[in-house]
Amino acid sequence: MKTAFRSVLALGLLLGLFLTASTALAADAKNVEATPQAKVYRASLKAIDTGDYAAYTKCMTSEAVKEIEKQTKEMGKTPKDGMEMMKMMAPSDIKLTDLKVDGKKAVLSATGKQDKETMYGTVNLEEEKGEWKVGKQSWTNKKS
């Protein structure tokens, strides 16, 4: 009788731990938006949408800013032109689905829409001078 009771108690504890862990994982997915990484990424999207180049560069890593300025110059475009191009190319309805942080680096996973097609994005972020910044990002229509 004691053995059966212990087995039921142990099973109950394991089930409780499993439910707690799975609830925590679900909560983590919902809380991606509350993270500093998501906030800086959303700020970069807002800057693109409004065409605010100064605000955009504040959200980006120093390396990403150098690359953007180099590409814009090579194309003979102004920063404003570059912002318009980014706005046209950016997916809409972006939903952040996952975040993995490893020290001063992080990767956001996202989905969005482009021409009515679901796109899957990976956004690399880095911590610079105590602030999270957006680095390179890539979007594809194939789920990885």
Region roles according to the model:
Residues 1-12:
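Bacterial N-terminal signal peptides that target proteins for export
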Residues 12, 21-50:
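Short, low-complexity N-terminal intrinsically disordered segments enriched in polar/charged residues
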Residues 27-33, 39, 74-120, 139-144:
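Surface-exposed, charged secondary-structure patches
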Residues 51-67:
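Short, well-ordered alpha-helical segments enriched in acidic and aromatic residues
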Residues 68-72:
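Short, charge-rich amphipathic alpha-helical segments embedded
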Residues 121-126:
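Hydrophobic/aromatic beta-strand elements that line small-molecule binding cavities or substrate pockets
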